[in-house]
Design a protein with these regions (language model features):
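Small/polar, glycine/serine/threonine/aspartate-rich low-complexity segments that form flexible
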Residues: 75-107, 116, 225-233, 276-314
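Hydrophobic/aromatic residues within transmembrane alpha-helices of membrane transport systems
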Residues: 42, 103, 149, 215, ...
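Amphipathic alpha-helical coiled-coil segments
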Residues: 49-66, 127, 134, 138-159, ...
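Bacterial Sec-pathway N-terminal export signals of envelope proteins
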Residues: 28-78, 83, 106-107, 115, ...
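Periplasmic alpha-helical coiled-coil/stalk elements that build and connect Gram-negative outer-membrane
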Residues: 2-5, 33, 134-246, 340-347, ...
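N-terminal signal peptide c-region/cleavage motif recognized by signal peptidases
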Residues: 22-27
Length: 420
């Protein structure tokens, strides 16, 4: 039996422990994700959504103190201490000298306190609207990334099938070269087509990698995979137009208008006086006796025309501007929806044309040219071009299908319900 030194044993154990720790530290992939799973995972894990939720929680916490009274004030002092004359420096010779302690409390007028509460509630509304807007953005970007990844991988598989189909063509060329019915230069044409397919594949691989990176950003999965079927989303123009006013962008603007209106109320509340009450106790030499004082201070907004009224007018103008901005945002959303619906209808028509006409024609032509080449009636270059044309038609059909899916996702998430 071999005995290892204690130091060597410790090094071995440390090495094993480090290996196990590194194994546990590897992030676990969520595995293949369906469309719905990806959107739900992003809604749960996106840091930007957590940041918006924290901002909303902060606004709610801040609102608790919005309409409360300010903290009381403790006043400490020494009054009427002689610094010259026969009593200079003495605390007891002058009956006016005293040490004082007092408390004061400010009472803002009720209109101001209510306006502050309304302002805090409006701040909560802005935070909540921001959370809704960010949630919709996260869901939209996640959904589009999943669609791009799904169709990008399908297009890659289509190109792989085309590349594999060239093997049969290569065998035909080899046989014709052996029989002397083909020129030696024609043996290079399948390789040229493979090179063209490789270029297309490299471009599509970059698209897939970019989509996977975008999906990883929102889901937190370091290597997301798209699985399942693409979403089947119903685009209902009537329902979408009817729900325009409930969209997060308009709700956010409504919250900003509420803030401006609360500022108007605050400006108007400044025309009402605030109160301050104070109590002071004065400690003097026992031979004179102690003293107490009670006082009330009242603000006098006597010059409203030069102070409060201009601020009120400015706040009202900002609120009115917010209402105009809301109408501008609404019109922009309506125009964007109409434009997106028009694009969707166009992409649907193009997809239908590709499926029903372009791809079947390209396939039939490729079959005819392949048979003609096999019969010696067509040169290899023409046969390869029609084969490449079929591949391009099939990839283009996938492109058009992806356009339709992207349209449906963008329209339903941007203008539709809050949840997919």
């Amino acid at each position: 039996m071999i005995m290892m030194p204690g130091r060597a044993v410790r090094r071995l154990l440390l090495s094993i422990g480090a290996t196990l720790a590194s194994a546990w530290a590897v992030p676990v992939s969520a595995g293949p994700l369906t469309y719905e799973q990806a959107v739900r995972l992003a809604a749960a894990n996106a840091p930007s959504l957590k940041a918006r939720a924290a901002a909303t929680a902060g606004a709610r916490s801040s609102a608790v103190a919005a309409d409360r009274l300010p903290d009381p004030t403790l006043d400490l002092g020494l009054q009427n201490f002689p610094v010259s004359g026969p009593n200079a420096g003495s605390f007891t010779r002058d009956d006016f000298t005293m040490a004082t302690i007092g408390f004061s409390q400010t009472f803002p007028n009720l209109a101001k306190r209510h306006a502050r509460a309304a302002r805090a509630a409006a701040d909560i509304g802005i935070a909540e609207a921001g959370e809704l807007v960010e949630g919709r953005n996260v869901r939209l970007e996640t959904a589009l990334a999943w669609v791009d990844l799904y169709y990008g991988e399908r297009r890659l598989r289509q190109l792989d099938l085309l590349d594999a189909s060239l093997d049969d063509l290569q065998k035909t060329v080899t046989a014709r070269l052996a029989s002397g019915s083909a020129r030696p230069s024609q043996a290079l044409e399948p390789d040229q087509l493979r090179a063209a397919i490789a270029d297309r594949r490299a471009e599509m691989a970059a698209v897939v990698a970019q989509a996977r990176a975008r999906l990883a950003r929102y889901t937190g999965d370091p290597d997301p995979q798209a699985t399942g079927d693409p979403p089947m989303l119903d685009v209902d123009p009537i329902r979408l137009r009817a729900g325009i006013d409930a969209l997060p962008a308009l709700r956010a603007q409504d919250a900003r208008i509420a803030v401006a209106e609360a500022d108007v109320r605050l400006a108007r509340a400044d025309k009402r006086p605030d109160w301050k009450v104070g109590v002071t106790y004065g400690r003097r030499d026992p031979m004179y006796g102690d003293m107490a004082s009670v006082g009330v201070s009242i603000d006098l907004p006597l010059f409203a025309g030069k102070r409060q009224n201009p601020r009120i007018a400015a706040s009202e103008s900002l609120a009115q501007g917010g209402r105009f901005d809301r109408e501008a945002i609404r019109r922009e959303l309506v125009a964007q929806l109409d434009a997106d619906l028009a694009d969707h209808a166009m992409h649907l028509s193009r997809l239908r044309n590709a499926r029903e006409t372009l791809v079947p024609l390209a396939r039939h032509r490729a079959e005819l040219d392949r048979d003609s080449y096999g019969a010696g009636k067509l040169d290899l270059g023409a046969a390869l071009l029609t084969t490449l044309g079929l591949a391009e038609a099939e990839v283009e059909a996938l492109n058009r299908e992806a356009d339709v899916a992207r349209d449906a996702v963008r329209i339903t998430i941007t203008y539709g319900e809050e949840r997919p």
